[in-house]
Amino acid sequence: MPTILIKFEKKTMKTFFKIIGLILLAILLFFAYSIMNPASPLDRVAFENDKVTFEVEYSRPFKKDRLIFGNKSDGALVPFGEYWRTGANAATNFSINSDITISGIRLMSGKYRLYTVPGEEQWEVFINSEADTFFAITEPDSAKDLMSFTITPQQLNETVEQFTIDFIPSPPDGPSSTGLRLRWDLTEIVIPFN
């Protein structure tokens, strides 16, 4: 082969590998940015007293002028009567370090998955043993549901822009339970536990 052709091939190969390297770097930077700055950021909340530590890990989507809860035909983001992972991105998981009672049912210490089926009049809440499933975006295995119960949603007076889970203390004149509160848009549910 002539020397000129060999030099040309080496230069072409170097350029080719540089371009491939830049493309791979751009893809890597895009994924790193997406993980570090998700549209629905990851959050953790915790409740602790002398009996239990209750920690929840979930992603917090924004309303962004969308219809959140409603009929599928109206374009609701979370349609009534359908599975919702109760957050965004991956499943909502929680852990408890000692046994608690939820809706009259005893739940042993451990890690769990929380999901819901919102409704206009009632929400179905499910506790599932399928926790920490990597990027669990599909419906969980219902055979692993440990309990389910219904909660009546409450209408809020002010819009909650970002999906929020927190804990509220029991009312002074009410039952001796704490509430796991879920709020988004104009809807709130409280899951009492003790």
Residue ranges and their predicted role:
Residues 1-13:
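N-terminal Lys/Arg-rich, disordered targeting/topogenic segments
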Residues 18-34:
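Hydrophobic membrane-insertion alpha-helices, especially the h-region
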Residues 34-56:
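Ser/Thr/Pro/Gly-rich low-complexity linker/stalk segments immediately outside membranes or between
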Residues 49, 102-103, 184:
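Structural motif
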Residues 50-79:
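Short extracytoplasmic
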Residues 86-137:
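Mid-length scaffold segments of soluble, non-membrane domains
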Residues 133-177:
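Surface-exposed, gly/pro-biased binding rims or lids
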Residues 177-185:
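Short, exposed beta-strand-loop hairpins at the edges of beta-sheets
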